[in-house]
UniProtKB/Swiss-Prot annotation:
Protein name: MAPK phosphothreonine lyase
Consequence of changing residue 106 to A: Marked decrease in enzymatic activity
Description of the deletion phenotype: Strains lacking this gene are attenuated for systemic virulence in mice.
Effect listed in the UniProt record for changing residue 134 to R: No effect on enzymatic activity
Entry's EC annotation: 4.2.3.-
Similarity comment: family membership: Belongs to the phosphothreonine lyase family.
pH dependence: Optimum pH is 8.5.
Result after altering residue 106 to N: Loss of enzymatic activity
Domain of life assignment: Bacteria
Keywords for the protein's UniProt record, in alphabetical order: Lyase, Plasmid, Secreted, Virulence
InterPro entries: OspF/SpvC, OspF/SpvC_sf
Residue numbers annotated as active site: 106, 136
Length: 241
């Protein structure tokens, strides 16, 4: 399927996401979620089901791999170049106005089913209704078979607070929760087999494919203490309880 390729000489780097570090101060985003957890949770429970209009005429996985240094599709800037093993997608006009607070989801599928998984999810990932402004998918031709992002975590969705003060609104949290549930359902409906969940992540029993990590307050090595801390993250609880 087509990808628009403007003839522009733009220097657009891959996503720069803040690395995990020890002793990180709890940002105001997290404090807001903790202090307003019950109110946000109650508001979310009363909201109607969200609907996501799927984008049409989106690239397939092969097309994504061929996006090169710069391409456009459905308002998303795409790039896949150099030694980076990921194909990056970034919404040209972000819907979320806050600063990244570390919240992200991985999607893990069987290595050989990444193209099929992308085909199942692409209409949602490129949807104008999607709450996800930035995401990436592994270019499976660039990674060795036993690599972490080969066995699982082939998709990463970065979630940013929707408000300018870097706080999440109840409506955005509800929309995000509904969106990830929709991704789960779509993969299951299409017979996609789940992959290896990263040791660094947590997920409830009913999630077969998605998992969560806050990368400002955790590392890739994981461990039970880290997973317990992640299960207590207010953002994660609002997505799962």
């Amino acid at each position: 399927m087509p990808i628009n390729r403007p003839n522009l000489n733009l220097n657009i780097p891959p996503l720069n996401i803040v690395a995990a570090y020890d002793g990180a101060e709890i940002p105001s985003t997290n404090k807001h979620l903790k202090n307003n957890f019950n109110s946000l949770h109650n508001q979310m429970r009363k909201m109607p089901v969200s609907h996501f209009k799927e984008a049409l005429d989106v690239p397939d996985y092969s097309g994504m791999r061929q996006s090169g240094f710069f391409a456009m599709s459905q308002g998303f800037q795409l790039n896949n170049h150099g030694y980076d093993v990921f194909i990056h997608a970034r919404r040209e006009s972000p819907q979320s106005q806050g600063k990244f607070a570390g919240d992200k989801f991985h999607i893990s599928v069987l290595r050989d089913m990444v193209p099929q998984a992308f085909q199942a999810l692409s209409g949602l990932l490129f949807s104008e209704d999607s709450p996800v402004d930035k995401w990436k998918v592994t270019d499976m031709e660039k990674v060795v078979q036993q690599a972490r992002v080969s066995l699982g975590a082939q998709f990463t969705l970065y979630i940013k607070p929707d408000q300018e003060n870097s706080q999440y609104s109840a409506s955005f949290l509800h929309k995000t929760r509904q969106f990830i549930e929709c991704l789960e359902s779509r993969l299951s409906e299409n017979g996609v087999i789940s992959g290896q969940c990263p040791e660094s992540d947590v997920h409830p029993e009913n999630w077969k494919y998605l998992s969560y990590r806050n990368e400002l307050r955790s590392g890739r090595d994981g461990g039970e203490m880290q997973r317990q801390a992640l299960r207590e993250e207010p953002f994660y609880r609002l997505m799962t309880e």
